A protein has these predicted regions:
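Glycosyltransferase catalytic domains, chiefly GT-A lineage
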Residues: 1-196
Length: 196
């Protein structure tokens, strides 16, 4: 993202990288004021089986000589606040992927836990990136497991957008297969917050 901003001559102090399956509430406070210039992330608060499997397997495959990332320090890759001081780190991440893409692709089908989030957690630890863990309200994730998505025939609570009261940035990940998929929730939330 830094390359894109630089190429287009856009000046910035900090930038938020957010996943495409998220919606930001229009009244969200200015989270840039909370980073102290550090790498801003939100701890992953979702399926810990997935997290620990990913940490163990990617650790064994790619980082066998490194300490395992602690699950309670593991952040969700869908919210990253960075600034120009992080450009060398992101270049190292790009170089790491370029140098290891065959191994990553080989292990991806076996691990089945994504190819970005855990690797960047390891690289953040290895490079000793000064990180600030921000409140979960800035990456409210795994909404289904938190009983924040009403699924007809499954949910006992009212069919309303409960998550709007629980955070500022809504991450529609880890939704089980059903007619109310990511597209449904993103469209419904967008219309609720921003109108048609």
């Amino acid at each position: 993202v830094h390359d894109i901003l630089q190429h287009n001559g856009i000046e910035y102090d900090q930038v938020l990288i957010v996943d495409a399956d998220t919606i930001i509430h229009p009244d969200t406070p200015n989270f840039f004021n909370e980073t102290d210039g550090k790498f801003g992330v939100v701890r992953n608060n979702g399926c810990y089986e997935w997290v620990t499997r990913s940490i163990d397997n990617w650790g064994n495959a790619l980082f066998p000589n490194e300490s395992k990332v602690k699950p309670w320090k593991y952040f969700n890759g869908g919210f990253q606040i960075t600034n120009k001081s992080h450009i060398p780190f992101y270049k190292d991440v790009q170089n790491y992927y370029s140098s290891n893409i065959q191994t990553i692709n080989q292990w991806n089908d076996k691990i089945k836990a994504g190819t970005d989030q855990t690797i960047i957690n390891y690289l953040t630890q290895i490079h000793n990136i000064d990180t600030i863990y921000m409140d979960e309200c800035y990456n409210l994730q795994d909404l289904f497991r938190k009983n924040l998505l009403h699924i007809p025939g499954h949910s006992w609570f009212n069919d309303e957008l409960h998550f709007l009261k629980a955070g500022w940035i809504y991450h529609f990940n880890a939704i089980p297969k059903n007619p109310r998929d990511v597209k449904y929730w993103m469209e419904r939330t967008y219309k609720e917050l921003y109108g048609n």
